[in-house]
């Protein structure tokens, strides 16, 4: 299947280094708000790439649940494949892609577990069925069929008809950024790329060649 002729010309916006915030978190928050306002499909969806013990990368989509001055928070099963990779090598890469705005954000940094109390607080806000699912799913494990998963979920629901506690193996990670790159599509593939990199306690802001 040849895909050579599928291409778009990017013309919607410009990213000026002069107009960027001094802090990448503030710049990200601005872009995140604009993505939500533009009704981008799944504006909080991000790809997270990890590396296993053999140095092989793997990636998957997760949802960003919080941005704060420390970094980017997502939640998952700590016993999943991604959790195992992070346990052995905490350095990860995140990518957001908002095609409606012709924008991409790339983040590299270290993932650390957030305090259990914070995971408890978020878990309590999840829909009941999602909390049941956290107990029923042995994430990344091979299962015989879908019916067995539903049966396990039913057993969990019978045990916890009202309040569902958070499993110890489920919680949040904070990705503490070391580099953050903002990409804005431009005509003729001469895209805008502004990178922030951490040096000591300061952020260095620089333009990259496309």
From Swiss-Prot:
<feature type="binding site">
    <location>
        <position position="82"/>
    </location>
    <ligand>
        <name>FMN</name>
    </ligand>
</feature>
<feature type="binding site">
    <location>
        <position position="193"/>
    </location>
    <ligand>
        <name>FMN</name>
    </ligand>
</feature>
<dbReference type="InterPro" id="IPR011576">
    <property type="entry name" value="Pyridox_Oxase_N"/>
</dbReference>
<feature type="binding site">
    <location>
        <position position="183"/>
    </location>
    <ligand>
        <name>FMN</name>
    </ligand>
</feature>
<dbReference type="GO" id="GO:0008615">
    <property type="term" value="P:pyridoxine biosynthetic process"/>
</dbReference>
<comment type="pathway">
    <text>Cofactor metabolism; pyridoxal 5'-phosphate salvage; pyridoxal 5'-phosphate from pyridoxine 5'-phosphate: step 1/1.</text>
</comment>
<comment type="similarity">
    <text>Belongs to the pyridoxamine 5'-phosphate oxidase family.</text>
</comment>
<feature type="binding site">
    <location>
        <begin position="189"/>
        <end position="191"/>
    </location>
    <ligand>
        <name>substrate</name>
    </ligand>
</feature>
<feature type="binding site">
    <location>
        <begin position="60"/>
        <end position="65"/>
    </location>
    <ligand>
        <name>FMN</name>
    </ligand>
</feature>
<dbReference type="GO" id="GO:0010181">
    <property type="term" value="F:FMN binding"/>
</dbReference>
<dbReference type="InterPro" id="IPR000659">
    <property type="entry name" value="Pyridox_Oxase"/>
</dbReference>
<feature type="binding site">
    <location>
        <begin position="75"/>
        <end position="76"/>
    </location>
    <ligand>
        <name>FMN</name>
    </ligand>
</feature>
<comment type="function">
    <text>Catalyzes the oxidation of either pyridoxine 5'-phosphate (PNP) or pyridoxamine 5'-phosphate (PMP) into pyridoxal 5'-phosphate (PLP).</text>
</comment>
<comment type="subunit">
    <text>Homodimer.</text>
</comment>
<feature type="binding site">
    <location>
        <position position="65"/>
    </location>
    <ligand>
        <name>substrate</name>
    </ligand>
</feature>
<dbReference type="GO" id="GO:0004733">
    <property type="term" value="F:pyridoxamine phosphate oxidase activity"/>
</dbReference>
<feature type="binding site">
    <location>
        <position position="81"/>
    </location>
    <ligand>
        <name>FMN</name>
    </ligand>
</feature>
<protein>
    <recommendedName>
        <fullName>Pyridoxine/pyridoxamine 5'-phosphate oxidase</fullName>
        <ecNumber>1.4.3.5</ecNumber>
    </recommendedName>
</protein>
<dbReference type="Pfam" id="PF10590">
    <property type="entry name" value="PNP_phzG_C"/>
</dbReference>
<feature type="binding site">
    <location>
        <begin position="7"/>
        <end position="10"/>
    </location>
    <ligand>
        <name>substrate</name>
    </ligand>
</feature>
<keyword id="KW-0664">Pyridoxine biosynthesis</keyword>
<dbReference type="InterPro" id="IPR019740">
    <property type="entry name" value="Pyridox_Oxase_CS"/>
</dbReference>
<dbReference type="Pfam" id="PF01243">
    <property type="entry name" value="PNPOx_N"/>
</dbReference>
<feature type="binding site">
    <location>
        <position position="126"/>
    </location>
    <ligand>
        <name>substrate</name>
    </ligand>
</feature>
<feature type="binding site">
    <location>
        <begin position="139"/>
        <end position="140"/>
    </location>
    <ligand>
        <name>FMN</name>
    </ligand>
</feature>
<feature type="binding site">
    <location>
        <position position="104"/>
    </location>
    <ligand>
        <name>FMN</name>
    </ligand>
</feature>
<keyword id="KW-0285">Flavoprotein</keyword>
<feature type="binding site">
    <location>
        <position position="130"/>
    </location>
    <ligand>
        <name>substrate</name>
    </ligand>
</feature>
<dbReference type="InterPro" id="IPR019576">
    <property type="entry name" value="Pyridoxamine_oxidase_dimer_C"/>
</dbReference>
<keyword id="KW-0288">FMN</keyword>
<keyword id="KW-0560">Oxidoreductase</keyword>
<feature type="binding site">
    <location>
        <position position="122"/>
    </location>
    <ligand>
        <name>substrate</name>
    </ligand>
</feature>
<dbReference type="InterPro" id="IPR012349">
    <property type="entry name" value="Split_barrel_FMN-bd"/>
</dbReference>
<comment type="pathway">
    <text>Cofactor metabolism; pyridoxal 5'-phosphate salvage; pyridoxal 5'-phosphate from pyridoxamine 5'-phosphate: step 1/1.</text>
</comment>
């Amino acid at each position: 299947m040849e895909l050579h002729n599928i291409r778009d010309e990017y013309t919607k916006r410009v990213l000026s280094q002069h107009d960027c915030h001094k802090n990448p978190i503030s710049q990200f928050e601005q872009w995140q708000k604009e993505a939500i306002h533009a009704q981008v499909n799944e504006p909080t969806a991000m790809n997270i790439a990890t590396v296993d013990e053999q140095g092989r990368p793997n990636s998957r989509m997760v949802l960003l649940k919080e941005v704060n001055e420390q970094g980017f928070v997502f939640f998952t099963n700590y016993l999943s494949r991604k959790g195992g990779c992070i346990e052995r090598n905490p350095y990860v890469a995140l990518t957001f892609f908002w095609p409606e705005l012709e924008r991409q954000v790339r983040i590299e940094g270290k993932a650390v577990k957030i305090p259990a109390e914070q995971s408890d607080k978020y878990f309590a806000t999840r829909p009941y069925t999602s909390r049941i699912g956290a107990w029923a799913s042995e994430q990344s494990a091979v299962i015989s069929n879908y019916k067995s998963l539903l049966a396990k979920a039913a057993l969990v629901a019978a045990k916890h008809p009202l309040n569902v506690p958070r499993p110890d193996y489920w919680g949040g990670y904070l990705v503490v950024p070391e580099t953050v790159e903002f990409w804005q599509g431009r005509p003729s593939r001469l895209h805008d790329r502004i990178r922030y990199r951490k040096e000591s306690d300061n952020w260095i802001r620089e333009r990259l060649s496309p």
